[in-house]
Amino acid sequence: MGAALALLGDLVASVSEAAAATGFSVAEIAAGEAAAAIEVQIASLATVEGITTTSEAIAAIGLTPQTYAVIAGAPGAIAGFAALIQTVTGISSLAQVGYRFFSDWDHKVSTVGLYQQSGMALELFNPDEYYDILFPGVNTFVNNIQYLDPRHWGPSLFATISQALWHVIRDDIPAITSQELQRRTERFFRDSLARFLEETTWTIVNAPINFYNYIQDYYSNLSPIRPSMVRQVAEREGTHVNFGHTYSIDNADSIEEVTQRMDLRNKESVHSGEFIEKTIAPGGANQRTAPQWMLPLLLGLYGTVTPALEAYEDGPNQKKRRVSRGSSQKAKGTRASAKTTNKRRSRSSRS
């Protein structure tokens, strides 16, 4: 490679001198255009002036034989030098590859399938969170450091803050706004519904209550004894039994006493169509008022159900009875005595 570089230096120097002597450029000499132009001039001199030798024609043009030889042989020399450089470079690259391959032979041969599982990774896999797992918070610290340039901390700080503000405006504010609108709409709807229930006029309707009262009366008037027993008593006495009455055979002398219907007590009830009177807050404070039976509904709409109201609706919590230590010790004593008696019995049976 050193010899090729030396030849290249000599060729460049010769071509440069020829270009300075003739006025042609180096590119024209390397391409062969200068040699073709000189040959045309020599041919014209031979035709016009009758010059027969090349040396006389070269001298007539004003060139030396060395310069003419350099100009005429420069294209071929450059082509041969290029081929030489390509050959030397290819051989050197092949030699370099072979040297690296054979020098690193032990490292390039895979031994994974010999002593380990086949298909195992040749390099260790370190995830992005590897150092953050070993040192929690290091990635956040490094990222924050990279955001600010110590040399130009002012513009970098302004760019970072403006970028964070833009992300907040673009991503966070729409989500927060939609959530707040949803909360306000839900709150407004609940408040409007609660105020509507407070201000509306309520009327008593006994139709559903009467239906449940009829069902309650029907099941309360049923006989505590089976109908087959009533038929047996009626057949024995020869009387007719009308079902649907209340029967009682306790201390009864005849079936007439059994089939007597119980007199229902006349209960005072509120008639349908009556309006519930609205109460006004005392003292003229114009506070919001509601009947007691409406409080669970209103407080449930506002989401402020108190523990006392929950106990009123669901009933008191049933707590488990705690067993005292004395009773547990007594129970243990009885168990121990039972075990000892069983042991004594087994001993007596063995003996």
UniProtKB/Swiss-Prot annotation:
This is Minor capsid protein VP2. Residues 312-351 are annotated as: Disordered. InterPro entries: Polyoma_coat_VP2 (IPR001070). Belongs to the polyomaviruses capsid protein VP2 family. GO terms for molecular function: channel activity; DNA binding; structural molecule activity. One of its GO terms (cellular component) is membrane. Keywords: Capsid protein, DNA-binding, Host endoplasmic reticulum, Host membrane, Host nucleus, Host-virus interaction, Ion channel, Ion transport, Late protein, Lipoprotein, Membrane, Myristate, Transmembrane, Transmembrane helix, Transport, Viral attachment to host cell, Viral ion channel, Viral penetration into host cytoplasm, Viral penetration into host nucleus, Viral penetration via permeabilization of host membrane, Viral release from host cell, Virion, Virus entry into host cell. A motif (Nuclear localization signal) lies at residues 315-323. It comes from BK polyomavirus (strain AS). The chain crosses the membrane at residues 289-309. Residues 272-307 are annotated as: D1. A lipid is attached at residue 2 (N-myristoyl glycine). Residues 312-351 are annotated as: DNA-binding. Residues 341-351 have a biased composition (Basic residues). One of its GO terms (biological process) is monoatomic ion transmembrane transport. It comes from the Viruses.
